[in-house]
């Protein structure tokens, strides 16, 4: 999980730079952490989907695939977009050129990493994010998979007990299928990961140091 900058700390494209750095850092330590450097995937939701998508289109350390849930990719269509663009660019006044630059669809090419996209037809916040990505990818003949579920608001996350936070409104067995569907797609796209008898102690140790895991997290072998 990447704790990227938000609000005023997001100026000058800080979130984009941070996810790019994170991917590079993981690849640098791939052997030490028993990670396949060619099976790194970004996954993001809403604004996080924007960051995860930007990593694949704009970064120097591109992921091998991307999984996007109800991503915010067409910023000119979102409420408060001028403020968002000012934050990202660090400018007091956003120009049309700035607006087009942060609209990630303008950066899709035939070399874009494969992408899996999930969204709902009832999403009122980012209603037109998923379909245009699929259309762009189709235009370039690039690998993608798209799932539009009929029901559900913006922000379903996993749509199960893990992310529902006790709210029945955030439970939806239909939308919850996106996770397994994305895993199946990743296996078809990147191949299934090879599991061995390696221990994750070093990875867990570093994740504790970075604050991504609690200090008492157990060091278990990869199954």
Regions found by a protein language model. Name each.
Residues 120-124, 151-153:
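Acidic beta-to-alpha connecting loop that harbors the catalytic carboxylate
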Residues 21-82, 96-99, 198-205:
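Primarily recognizes the serine-hydrolase "nucleophile elbow" in alpha/beta-hydrolase
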Residues 10-31, 177-180:
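Alpha/beta-hydrolase active-site loop
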Residues 138-223:
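C-terminal catalytic histidine-bearing segment of alpha/beta-hydrolase fold enzymes
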Residues 3, 43, 67-70, 118, ...:
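Alpha/beta-hydrolase-fold catalytic nucleophile elbow
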Residues 111, 116-119:
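Short beta-strand/loop motif that positions the catalytic acidic residue
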Residues 1-9:
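Conserved alpha/beta-hydrolase
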Residues 124-131:
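Conserved alpha/beta-hydrolase "acid-adjacent" motif
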């Amino acid at each position: 999980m990447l704790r990227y900058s938000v609000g005023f700390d997001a100026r000058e494209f800080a979130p984009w730079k941070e996810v790019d750095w994170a991917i590079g850092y993981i690849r640098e330590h791939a052997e030490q952490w028993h990670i396949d450097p060619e099976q790194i995937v970004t996954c993001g939701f809403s604004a996080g989907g924007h960051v995860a998508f930007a990593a694949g289109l704009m970064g120097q350390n591109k992921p091998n695939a991307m999984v996007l849930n109800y991503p915010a990719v067409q910023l000119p269509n979102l409420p408060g977009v001028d403020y968002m663009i000012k934050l990202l660019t660090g400018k007091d006044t956003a120009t049309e050129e700035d607006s087009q630059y942060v609209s990630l669809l303008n950066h899709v090419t035939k070399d874009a990493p494969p992408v899996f996209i999930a969204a709902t037809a009832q999403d009122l916040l980012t209603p037109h994010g998923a379909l245009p990505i699929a259309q762009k990818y189709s235009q370039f003949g690039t690998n993608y998979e798209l799932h539009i579920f009929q029901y559900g608001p913006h922000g379903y996350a996993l749509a199960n007990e893990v992310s529902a936070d006790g709210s029945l409104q955030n439970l939806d067995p239909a939308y919850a299928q996106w996770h397994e569907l994305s895993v199946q797609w990743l296996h078809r796209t990147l191949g299934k990961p090879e599991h061995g008898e390696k221990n994750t102690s070093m990875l867990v140790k570093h994740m504790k140091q970075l604050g991504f895991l609690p200090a008492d997290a157990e060091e278990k072998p990869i199954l």
